[in-house]
């Protein structure tokens, strides 16, 4: 990336989540040797933790929160580019958008939200329509490679800007959530 006047910093915080004991085994060995853990992987992708590894929730609560605190302290009002793996990107999305467990589960199960290789998320505090800057991130735009079926070439698909708002519950909303449990 030839970004003018860029200052790059390498950090272990952006590493892929730890896959623990299953890091070096095949998927078939995982299914055979960790059958119960394999079952949980598919039913609870947010809190599922590989044996001796990290869940996406662990990554969000520990590394992503620390990363955002550090960026706030060191990079105020600067543009920041981060390059990382998909699960850390999911943890970043979970944290920045303050997703509920239910919304995270919906996205994890949806092809529309799948993070493929070379997917880019662009978060912004600047309203793309008005240029007005807000205190917190409120917009996200995704770019991802897709295969053009007509000519077999890869192209970059850039989604429209999407505004997100952190959920705030009224008293009645909170009562409804409690009753739903």
Explain the meaning of each model-derived region.
Residues 30, 59-60:
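Conserved anionic group-binding/transfer micro-motifs
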């Amino acid at each position: 990336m030839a970004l003018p006047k860029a200052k790059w910093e390498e950090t272990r915080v952006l590493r892929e989540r730890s896959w623990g004991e299953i890091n070096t085994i095949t998927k078939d060995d995982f299914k055979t040797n960790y059958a119960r853990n394999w079952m949980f992987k598919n039913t609870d992708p947010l809190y599922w933790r590989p044996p001796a590894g990290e869940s996406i929730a662990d990554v969000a609560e520990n590394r992503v929160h620390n990363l955002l605190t550090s960026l706030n302290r060191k990079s105020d009002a600067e543009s920041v580019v981060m390059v990382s793996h998909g699960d850390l990107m999911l943890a970043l999305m979970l944290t920045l958008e303050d997703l509920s467990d239910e919304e995270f589960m919906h996205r994890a199960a949806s092809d529309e939200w799948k993070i493929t290789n070379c997917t880019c998320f662009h978060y912004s505090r600047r309203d793309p329509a008005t240029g007005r800057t807000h205190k917190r991130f409120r917009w996200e735009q995704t770019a991802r490679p897709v295969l053009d079926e007509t000519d077999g070439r890869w192209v970059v698909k850039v989604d429209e800007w999407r505004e997100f708002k952190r959920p705030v519950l009224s008293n009645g909303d909170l009562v409804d959530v409690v009753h739903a449990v």
